[in-house]
Amino acid sequence: HVSLAKETGAAIVFGPTAQTSFKAIIAEDGQEFKIGVITIVALHTPGHTMESTTYLLRDENGKDYAIFSGDTLFLGDVGRPDLAQKGADMTQADLAGILFNSLRTKIMTLSDDLIVYPAHGAGSACGNNLSKETVGNRGEQKQTNYARRTDMTKEEFIKEVTDGLLPPPQYFPLNVKMNKEGYDDIS
């Protein structure tokens, strides 16, 4: 992201509470960004990390069209609530409860026909049930994503997303560091 911003002059946008050592816009929940005739709305969806943010794309008519859900919502799963919190004063259960609230108040209130673009698909340690698909819609996720069940209590959700979590991959602290500090450009 640092190299892309440098090459294009585009701003880097992070969610609320993010701390970086490079120039970035720290978006507020609900903050809107205009790009031509479309609008991007930052929806603060903490739980995977405290700065996790979902970006809602509104078309030229102001209609909600898609979400870029990062690691908050995957196709088939949600982001595990422990990877970026080493040393924080929060437990996995605390973060899972925050993630539950984010899903219920920010994402599950959106239209079923909304396109969902997660950060990535299967092959990551970020969740146990990530789909190989890289694009879907919110309605499909309501039917197929265990974490989106409307009858699931907060306590059930916390247990479901925290049971059986393996230790974070050894490389993950480096990922967190690069997100905050940038990286050496090798181009």
Region annotations inferred by a language model:
Residues 4-14, 55, 66-68, 117-118, ...:
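N-terminal, helix-rich and Lys/Arg-enriched segments in bacterial and organellar proteins
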Residues 1-41:
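Glycine/alanine-rich phosphate-binding loops at beta-alpha junctions
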Residues 89-90, 94-187:
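Accessory terminal helices/loops
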Residues 24-114, 121-129, 137:
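Catalytic core of the metallo-beta-lactamase
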Residues 6-8, 13-15, 19-21, 48, ...:
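Mixed-charge, polar/low-complexity N-terminal
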